[in-house]
Every structure is written in C-alpha cells, then in structure tokens.
Amino acid sequence: MQNFEIDYVEMYVENLEVAAFSWVDKYAFAVAGTSRSADHRSIALRQGQVTLVLTEPTSDRHPAAAYLQTHGDGVADIAMATSDVAAAYEAAVRAGAEAVRAPGQHSEAAVTTATIGGFGDVVHTLIQRDGTSAELPPGFTGSMDVTNHGKGDVDLLGIDHFAICLNAGDLGPTVEYYERALGFRQIFDEHIVVGAQAMNSTVVQSASGAVTLTLIEPDRNADPGQIDEFLKDHQGAGVQHIAFNSNDAVRAVKALSERGVEFLKTPGAYYDLLGERITLQTHSLDDLRATNVLADEDHGGQLFQIFTASTHPRHTIFFEVIERQGAGTFGSSNIKALYEAVELERTGQSEFGAARR
C-alpha cells in the first residue's frame, strides 16, 4: 500500500494579491514561487513545512472559475507526495476513485503527477519527486529557500489535520472510500452532542500518519448546527478548517494577534472550570486565559488549541493553531466544555452541573 504525505494545499481565490497579502502580512508566510498560464495565476507561499498555493483563474476554462462561483475562496486540492504515482493512481482508480488526470511527467523531468477525486469537488494531486522533497510545486519558478517565514514567533510548523464537512449520510461512504482507495485507516470515531445539536465524526489517517482528515457530518435527528450552516453557505462538502501545528500555541497566538489575526473569544467561565478537568503541565492558566487558548487531554498527554474567526465573506473556512504535548485526539471535550461555560455565563449560575440541560 502506498504511503502519503502532504505536499501542498491549493486554494482557489477571487483576488490573488489580496489573498497573498493576508497570508504574508498576518500569518508570516513568505512568497516562494509563482506560476502563470493562459487561464490562471498562482503564488506558492511557504512557512515551516507548509506550502500553500493560491490560484486565481484568468479564464472560465480553468476549474477555479466554476469552483469560485459555487463556493467562493476555499481549498480545492490537498496534494499528496508518494513514491510511486502510477501505482497509487492505478490502485485508487481500480478501487473506485474518480480519475481526474492520468499520470504524466512535467518539464521538471524528476516530477510525475496525477489527480484523483477526493470529497465533494476537492481533489488530490499525487506527486512523485525523484529529487529533493523541498522543491516547488510543478510549474512554479522561484526558490523554496525562503528566510523570512515564521518571523515574529508565529512558527506554524506544519499541518496537523483538515476538518471536512460532509452532507448527512456521506460520512460512512467517504471513510470507506479513503480506506479502500488510498489505504487510510480510522483512528478516532465519535458522536458529539452539543445542546440540541449533534454531529458524527470519524478521523482517517494515511499509513504514515502524515495526512489526517477529520470527517464530519450533521446528525439528521438533531437540530441544525454549524455543520449544516457550513454546507449551506459553502454549497456542498468542503474543508471547514486547516489546523496548523505549533510548538508553543500561546506564543504563536500572541504573535499572530499582534499581526492582526482575530481569534474566537473564550468565555471566562471556561477557565474557571478548567482546573476541575485538567492539571496543566505546560502553560499557566493565566496565559491560556489571556490568549483564549483551549486545553484538553487524553491518555497520551495534553493539547492546546484555538480557532480563528472566519474572514470569509460566507463565514465558511477558518483556521486553527494546535500544540500537541503527547495528545493524539482532537479536543472534542472542549466543544462540550465551551457550551457549558457559555451556559454558566448566560444564566449566571456558579455551579458547573447546574448549567447542564
């Protein structure tokens, strides 16, 4: 079975300069390369091990044109590196994957690519590099040897996971597809209830552990919630957020906040109750409260996470900063803890249990 790692993430954008400026100015990414053809313009950005490609269509012939009309700016391609593109492509298509583009070599003779369908209209470009792994995406000119990324203690090291919203009823078939076509395995599964809302979630991961997809569908038997809202506003399945990992979430959030990134606010009651759930090992309660960073733990250790406020015109995609100190799960207890903390502040009750419905 083929092994996969993240090579780059491509987002389709309405305005290339505006989108690139935001990533460089607010998130401290650096421009690593550019690409242009008769139907598109692209910029490759780099920070840590993250390569982000932004593409603006210049012709209706480019698939970005139809994507943007339907969804607005968003993730269109999660490209994955593998040692044998032809074998991976053939196995995936044989197992039912949509064949988007057959394997072919680029002008860079050492690079072979192919493309298959993923979820919704998001695809996976498969990339085989016979040279160094630090090369630009195919078709780009420039240099990956950038020196100004990560400045100001932002330090986004890589991509921890993608959170993906699916239509109700599509979770099981999508999980089975990634297992069958790409050899992913399930590592986590849960049903989350938050008040009258509920969702089902399954996490699938490549054999190497380098590509992690958190797949989520709304529970048809519960009230509509944030997953339903995303599906409505995005007009279909798609990437809800990208989680960037950091060695120090508190420091990263301080640096990003100074650069103008807005994060979701956490009710003070959450921190009043946090000590009942967790004995903090890394960060102080005061630091977490000051930065709105959430904390959780599992049998492996602790994690610290925070979500940005969405700046998308449709309020769809947003981003996450996550620091793992041994934890292997995804902070699901924070969803319930935040809900109950909001209830405490809303009702003015002093006892945690009294806020439960």
UniProtKB/Swiss-Prot annotation:
Family designation: Belongs to the 4HPPD family.
* EC number of the protein: 1.13.11.46
For this protein, the record's InterPro entries field holds: 4OHPhenylPyrv_dOase, 4OHPhenylPyrv_dOase_C, 4OHPhenylPyrv_dOase_N, Glyas_Bleomycin-R_OHBP_Dase, Glyas_Fos-R_dOase_dom, VOC
Q: Which Pfam families match?
A: Glyoxalase, Glyoxalase_5
The name under which this protein is listed is: 4-hydroxymandelate synthase
Repeat listed as a keyword: yes
Cofactor(s) required for function per UniProt: Fe cation
Spans traversing the lipid bilayer? none
Quote the pathway field: Antibiotic biosynthesis; vancomycin biosynthesis
Residues annotated for substrate binding in this entry = 161, 201, 214, 241, 305
Q: Which PROSITE patterns match?
A: VOC (PS51819)
Binding-site residues, Fe cation: 161, 241, 320
Which transformation does this protein catalyse, written as a reaction? 3-(4-hydroxyphenyl)pyruvate + O2 = (S)-4-hydroxymandelate + CO2
**A GO term for molecular function:** 4-hydroxyphenylpyruvate dioxygenase activity
Q: Which UniProt keywords apply?
A: Antibiotic biosynthesis, Iron, Metal-binding, Oxidoreductase, Repeat
Q: Which organism is it from?
A: Amycolatopsis orientalis (Nocardia orientalis)
What does the record note about the cofactor?
Answer: Binds 1 Fe cation per subunit.
Q: What does this protein do?
A: Required to synthesize hydroxyphenylglycine, a recurring skeletal component of nonproteinogenic macrocyclic peptide antibiotics such as vancomycin. Catalyzes the conversion of p-hydroxyphenylpyruvate to p-hydroxymandelate. The decarboxylation and hydroxylation activities of HmaS show novel and distinct regioselectivity, compared to all other known p-hydroxyphenylpyruvate dioxygenases, by hydroxylating the benzylic position of the substrate instead of the phenyl ring.
Binding partners and assembly: Monomer.
Domain VOC stretches: 5-129, 158-309
Enzyme class (EC, first level): oxidoreductase
GO BP of this protein: tyrosine catabolic process; vancomycin biosynthetic process
